[in-house]
Every structure is written in C-alpha cells, then in structure tokens.
Amino acid sequence: MEKTYNPQDIEQPLYEHWEKQGYFKPNGDESKESFCIMIPPPNVTGSLHMGHAFQQTIMDTMIRYQRMQGKNTLWQVGTDHAGIATQMVVERKIAAEEGKTRHDYGRDAFIDKIWQWKAESGGTITRQMRRLGNSVDWERERFTMDEGLSNAVKEVFVRLYKEDLIYRGKRLVNWDPKLRTAISDLEVENRESKGSMWHIRYPLADGAKTADGKDYLVVATTRPETVLGDTGVAVNPEDPRYKDLIGKFVILPLVNRRIPIVGDEHADMEKGTGCVKITPAHDFNDYEVGKRHALPMINILTFDGDIRESAEVFDTKGEESNVYSSEIPAEFQKLERFAARKAIVAAVDALGLLEEIKPHDLTVPYGDRGGVVIEPMLTDQWYVRADVLAKPAVEAVENGDIQFVPKQYENMYFSWMRDIQDWCISRQLWWGHRIPAWYGNDGNVYVGRTEDEVRQENNLGADVQLRQDEDVLDTWFSSALWTFSTLGWPENTDALRQFHPTSVMVSGFDIIFFWIARMIMMTMHFIKDENGKPQVPFHTVYMTGLIRDDEGQKMSKSKGNVIDPLDMVDGISLPELLEKRTGNMMQPQMAEKIRKRTEKQFPNGIEPHGTDALRFTLAALASTGRDINWDMKRLEGYRNFCNKLWNASRFVLMNTEEQDCGFNGGEMTLSLADRWILAEFNQTVKAYREALDNFRFDIAAGILYEFTWNQFCDWYLELTKPVMTGGSESELRGTRHTLVTVLEGLLRLAHPIIPFITETIWQRVKVICGITADTIMLQPFPEYNAAQVDEAALADTEWLKQAIVAVRNIRAEMNIAPGKPLELLLRGCSEEAVRRVNDNRSFLLNLARLESITVLPADDKGPVSVTKIIDGAELLIPMAGLINKEDELARLAKEVAKIEGEIARIEGKLSNEGFVARAPEAVIAKEREKLDGYAEAKAKLIEQQAVISAL
C-alpha cells in the first residue's frame, strides 16, 4: 500500500469503476425488502453547495448501509428545471453577451436558448454529485421537464381540474414588478427597514362626529400611495372611541369616494390611531377584511408597479363591478409607485389632511431574485383547492403513517396544514410546464392534455380559434409529484410497485411546507395501493438543520462566506478563492470586506482534504434538526482520522500479508488483547447500528472515531507488539487472525460514511481473508455477535489500560523522558490486582516502558515515590535519581508565572466593557474557554509543586 494516504489518487478512478460495474443499481431481488430514497432534485443549471453536500452525505450513508444489508436499494436521482432561477440566469446571459431581452427572441426561440444552456451547464451538478461518492442509480436519472415527467404533470393538472380541485380565480399574490411574475412566499425576503407612518385625516360623511366631537378619523399608514385603492376603514368593534361609527361612512381624500366604516378585530385599539385603511387589492390582511365585509377591490397598479391610468374595480368574487368609479386623478397617473407616494403625501398635505409623520420601523418584503419591493397584486391565477387535499395529509402524520425526525417538526407541519390557503400554481414565466388550458374567442376555457384532445372532447372544429394559456406552473407543482412521477406514473410500472412508498425523505425544514407537505397531498390523492388506500410518498421525513459559517451566519454569495464543498475536497489557492468570492458580485461594494475576512480565515487558501474527510465531518455535525456552524478544525481532524486509518492498515498488512493468519486452519491462541478487541468491536457494532437506525449520524460518527482511533489504533495495535515480537506460533496466528478480522469488519462498518478509503484498503485485506467478492459495497454489514463479548477480557484490559496511563501520566507530570525505563512498585494490592499483574506482565513492561514490576508485601510502605491510585492497587514510581528537586521546582514556578500572565491578560479583556459590548458572542465564549483551560492547567501545576516539595 502507498506510504501516504492520497485521496486525489484513489477517489475518482474508484467511483468510475463502481459506476461502470453497476454497483449502484437495485439488486432486483423482490424477495428482499426494498429501500428507496428520492434525492431532492437540485437546480439543473446550479452547482453543489454545502447544504447539498450535507444532505447527500446523509442519504448516501443510509443507502450504502441498507444496500449492505442485502435490501433491494434504489437511490433515485434527478434535477429540477427551477423555473424562475434558470430563466433569470439565461436572461442575464443574453443581456450581457448580446444586449438582448427574452422579448427580442420571442417565446419559442428563448426556450430553445434555455434548453441549449441546460445542455451546456446541466452536467456540472451531476459531476459534482459523483465527486461526493453518491451511489445513485444514474441510469434512472430524471429531469422535471423530461417527456415522462411532463406527461405526469399534465395528467395531474387535468385530473384535478376535472375534479374541481383546480380553478382560475382573481386573488392576491406576491407580485415581483421587476420580473413581472407571481412568486411564492419562499422567494420573498423580509427585510427590516426604517420608514415612516403617515397619519391622514379621512373626513366623516353625513355630518357624523367621533366621540370627542371631531368630524374626521385619523388613519395611520406606511403606504400612502395605496390610498387611491381604499374601499373601507376598519375600527375594532370593542373600541369605545369609534364603535358608534360602525356602519357610517368617510369621504376618501383625493378621490372623494364614499367608503364604509366597518367593525373588525383586525383593527388593534392599541396600535396607531385604532383606525385602519382597508385596501383589499394591495394588502393581504386587507384582502381578508374585505372578504369578511364584502368590500369591493380596487386595483390601482400596473404589473410594473406604476399607477394605472384608470383603476380596475372588482367585487369580492373578483368579477368586474361598477360600484365605484375607476377614475384616478390625472396628476398621479403613470407615476412609478414610490414617486406616487411622494406626490400623494404632498397632495394630502396641501388639502390640510396630513396630521403628522412619525418614524416607524417596519418589515418590507423584497423578491430574493429580482431584489425589488414585492407588491401584493390582484391577478388572475390558477389555484389548487388545498383544504380538500390537506385533510388526508394531516391524518397520515397524526396516525403515524409518516413520521418526522426530529418529532417536533410535526407541530410546524400541523400548524401550516390546518390553516392552509389555496395554492397559487401559475407563474408569469416562459420556462416551465406550460398550463394545459386553452381559451376560445367566446371566453370559454378548455383544459386537456393537448390541443387535439381539447378539440375532440369539446367538438371544436378547425375553424374555432384557440390560444393556449401563456403561464407556466410553479416549479413546486412538478416537484410535488417527484416520488411517483420518477418511477413511471401514470403507467403502473414495476418500479412503482417495488419502491413506492419510498423509505426516507431528507430535507431542510425551510421547505417543509413548499415541498414536503405538497408531496404528501399530491401523492395521497393520486397513488393508491391494491386495496384503494391512499399511499404516502415516504414513511419517514428526516429534517436537517442549515449549514452556517463558523460565526453562525447563513452562507450566501452576497456575504462572501460560501465554502464550495469541492474546494475542501481538492483544495484551492487564496487568489482563486478570492476571485470566487468577490467576482461577479451583485453588490461590488462588499468585495473589500469579503477579501479581508477571507485572507484572515484562509491565509494560504484551503488545503485538499479528500471526499471521505468531508463526508465524515458532515456526518459528525449532523445533530438532529439544529443549525450547524461549519468548523474547518473538525475537517482537519477527520482528515487526520483518514491518515490514521491508512497508517494502521499498513501496520496490519505489514504484519499479516504472506503470513499464516489462521484462515487455512492451524491452532490459534487468542491473547487477552485479542479477546478484548473482539468484544470492543462487537459492542461498537451494536451501538453504531442503533445510531444509524435512529438517524443519529453524529453519534454513529463519534462511535466510529472513538473505536478506530482510541481502541484499535492507540491500544490494540500497541498491545499486539509483545505477541508479535515473542509469541508462540499459535499466539502469532491468533493475533494475526484478529488483526485482519477486526480491520476487515471495521472497514465494512465505516464504509457507508467513508466509502473511498475503506474500499481501497479492503481490496488488500480481502486477499488475506480469502474473500473473493469484487467490492466492499455489496458485502454484508457487520452484525453484533454476543458470543464474542468476553466480559472478563474487557475488565482485565480496562485495568491494564488504567495502570499504563497512570505510569505515563507520572512521566509527563514529572518531566521524565518517555524512553527512560522505570521501576514500578504496587502497594496495597487486591488478589484480583495481583492476578492481573502476573497474567499480563509482558504487556505492562512493554507498554509502560518499565524495567521491573514489584508487588510490595502488605507492611512495606516503599521508598519516596510519586503515587497514583488505580482499581485495587496503588502504583509507586520511586523518584530517587530521576529528577533534581530544585531544578524541577524552579521549572514549575516558571510555568505557573507564565500561565498567571495569560490569565491576567484574558481577565483584563473580559472586564473591559468596550470589548464585551463589541465582540461577537463566539469570540467572548472562546476567551472564557481559554480562561477555564489556563485555570485548570495552573491547578495541576500547583498539585505537582506540592508532590515534589514533599519528596
């Protein structure tokens, strides 16, 4: 085996070999249980980020673990067309390269351009997924706009429409005036902002007066430009100031519209003036108030966010109405919305109706892609009636057919599902699944899978003109069908029969509603088992936290704190990293700050760590459902782990290859250490499997690390040396056999988390064991064997370890050279301790570097010594001739003084109010941690001073 572990040499060739051999495919054995995971489809033209790497590592660990248990295992892979994101990338590209817009191209040519871009860049993410070691079945790869999935989408739309579960209606949506499309709540970013609250007088009509004799109401608003669309003023029905005015009217400033005063809980007596203007066409809360009180809806904005030349007036059903005039004062027509705000405030002020302006902190919704303020907009959109679909989806979680891990996410799911609104599924984009609806000149709407089908079903001749709806479906609509459409639905395929319902869905909690809930609703509506019972899409939902940077900040390009997972695998120089983080920025003014931070964090760039080290780190950080702060030190630690495993394996191979390891018969004697490591290994297998079965990847990683590093490498390999240098034939055979057997089992155990290094080493180890199989991937996963757990061997070895550690600690504390042989005396020994010393003298002499071991008679106190107490005995190391008392005390005094200086420095820092107020919490916590460490070190040194003074 190569002397040093170099992941760059082994990982890619190995993956290509696995893929070529077809090891990722299901085994097709229907007598075995199936296990299936659907990958959350990443954006087809995107690239892999830490969230992907994190979730995919968890999925691959589960898939490899189940595959090794002989299950018929499928990890379904695919990518998402990502409507708005992909369209924007291509729009930006043609603007930059050709100075054109999509309208210059026209719809068909622009869509061709996107398909072209997909062909060019669509391979990036799948290449990166291969680099992670993902054992997905590439032959089944799907794309949300491939032919099969497009047919499934049409099928679902048509069926839901025919069941009256899809309708077209005029409702309020999040409108992005820059992109000119409706967007989902997930694409809205709420930003804190310092704004104003304008207090405007609305004159009361018909001589009405308030309780304190005023002939107007004062209405407070943060959006005076929407005054033109008001159709009511709400007051709280319990408010003594205004309750007598409910049912009366005010005259709306600037347009002189007579609008009613309504009593509604939405008006808060404590907030503002207690009077709230109601603009149902431009505010989500007002829309609901308007529906409750049958207030008309007046839309005053164009799709670009400008004031219209004349308003659109609708009743609460969204039908055109002439209950109010559609006139808009000429001076506001065509004004951009924020210019209109200024003009309207000035006009209200000129009329003497502006009472006051107060500074006000508010939350403003921005489109996360377009970057402009989102406008609630009344538009014609297609909707899914969600309440009907939600009922069975809630029951499936209530009765345990679907379980959330961690369980607390069920509450989040229930709170959304029990208050579900109809789902707006149309988007004003070009890239996506075009809505299968056609309009006749007579205003009729026809829905069908194709135009031909529509004409046939409705007896429409070739002379009848039809035009297809321009809109496309929300990307989440096709993703909601992901678990069954990828398996070949609407055909009744073998894949559906074998792999649906799927086993586990791994997802971030941020899309629990947008994706998880909708998958449950859609699947249960369309997929039934042979008894007609609705099928769930998956049995378990495993929720991950979000990966943040080392300071707990969300990773984003604008913050310049994104770490590309493959840069940790392959390494990246500082100049390349800076270019990556500061090139093509939306906000170039941030570049300098980002450059400084990056130079401080990665002065030499990022070193290569290999995929296995990255995967191990991600698994170790996967604590349930909490956000995770990325830690480069952990990554280094797990790279060191891979090196340690490599070096330990070389030691095993050097001592066993071409040697008699007892696999072909011959007498074998197992030493205490052999029996102990077999017991430890089996206990590890049991705990590790339990952790994986309970989705505790962090605990599993910890168990693997602890056994490999501490028990196998640090203790067992050392404990084999006395046998290797002086054992009998049968002892040598026993120890070699144990070395190889435990290493081979350990490689299988670790394989799901660190696949590359384990396969590479296993290919060498299998030869010694006489295994002829081709790959570790399809080997049986280790099982717990209680017969190998020798309790006596565990107890005796723990005692030996205690004794060896005690001697090593005395060496370290007394500053005695590690190589200097020592004399060990034991005082006050129990019978058990005497037996253990006599049985294991060679281990003790060897590992504790002793020249002699003497058990003192009961009445012998022994010479002046440094002592340690262990189970059933006191260990003494005589100090005569080992140390110079004066020199040692002087050295310790120097050490204490140095530490006291550090303690004073940190205490000074922490008592500085300025530092504590300014420094991030993480920095303060680190300083406190250092302080505790120094205090502990000082206490130990003082203890040593006392011991040496007494000599």
Swiss-Prot record:
Where on this chain is 'HIGH' region (motif)? 42-52
Which Gene Ontology BP annotations are present? valyl-tRNA aminoacylation
Q: What Gene Ontology terms describe where this protein resides (cellular component)?
A: cytosol
Place the motif 'KMSKS' region on the sequence. 554-558
State the coiled-coil residue ranges. Answer: 880-944
GO MF terms on file?
aminoacyl-tRNA deacylase activity; ATP binding; valine-tRNA ligase activity
At the top of the EC hierarchy, this enzyme's class is: ligase
Q: What is known of its domains?
A: ValRS has two distinct active sites: one for aminoacylation and one for editing. The misactivated threonine is translocated from the active site to the editing site. The C-terminal coiled-coil domain is crucial for aminoacylation activity.
Record function comment: Catalyzes the attachment of valine to tRNA(Val). As ValRS can inadvertently accommodate and process structurally similar amino acids such as threonine, to avoid such errors, it has a 'posttransfer' editing activity that hydrolyzes mischarged Thr-tRNA(Val) in a tRNA-dependent manner.
Instruction: Cite the record's note on assembly.
Output: Monomer.
Family named by the database record: Belongs to the class-I aminoacyl-tRNA synthetase family. ValS type 1 subfamily.
**Protein name, per record:** Valine--tRNA ligase
Species this protein is from: Salmonella paratyphi A (strain ATCC 9150 / SARB42)
